[in-house]
Structure formats: C-alpha cells, structure tokens
C-alpha cells in the first residue's frame, strides 16, 4: 500500500517538511520534494530516513490502463476535393501535409497508389 506523508520531525534537517510516498510492500520511500541531499523521484529504503515523525496526506492514484493493440486515430482536416485536386495538380499543393500512421508527410511525396489509399481510408460513406 502506498501512502503520502509530510515529515514533521526528523534528526536530519534536510528531511523536515519534505514530502514522500511510502510503499509498505517494498519498504521504500520515493521523494516528492525535499531540501538538500534527496533528489526528486529518488527512491530509498525507508530505514534511510531514520527516526521521523510525519503526517499522512491524501493520495489519489490514477488507474493505469494497459492496452495492447489499441486504437489509433489520425486527424486530417481536409475535404475530399482538396486531396483529389492535389492528385491531379500536385504543383498547386507543394506544402500539403497530412498525418499517416502518426507521422506528418507531404501528400505529394506519396506514390499515386498511396495517395488513393489515403483518400479511400480518410473519406468513407459509413462506419
């Protein structure tokens, strides 16, 4: 179990008023904020803190979501007509940039087959 603390008394003056997360299962403390010898995010054994007194602080832990094979969304704010015109008149659109698989790419640098694929995948009649 993890609990948040603020150290109110300690033999080491650098610990006074510092904030920590204590992990009772691992017997470790993670520094959130302290003066002197402890760095932010430094993890130490609880015993390294020595004799301390503290007050508990509320801790909100956001649940983590692990998704494999999750969803991916590319947003292109264009009209179908613009892309089709770029296929037929590439000189009019030298700077036209689109998102493909998370990367920005110049539309004119794609092969004609890739350009058609982008248009087909981007503009559908229904889901």
From Swiss-Prot:
Modified residues (Glycine radical): 102
Record protein name field: Autonomous glycyl radical cofactor
Family matches, as HAMAP family: GrcA (MF_00806)
NCBIfam families in alphabetical order: spare_glycyl
GO CC terms in record: cytosol
Organism placement in taxonomy: Bacteria, Pseudomonadati, Pseudomonadota, Gammaproteobacteria, Pasteurellales
Domain Glycine radical: 5-127
Function as written in the Swiss-Prot or TrEMBL entry: Acts as a radical domain for damaged PFL and possibly other radical proteins.
Single annotated GO MF: formate C-acetyltransferase activity
InterPro entries per record: Auton_GlycylRad_Cofactor (IPR050244), Form_AcTrfase_GR_CS (IPR019777), Gly_radical (IPR001150), Glycyl_radical_cofactor_GrcA (IPR011140)
Gene that encodes the chain: grcA
Species: Haemophilus influenzae (strain PittGG)
Keywords: Organic radical
A Pfam family per the record: Gly_radical
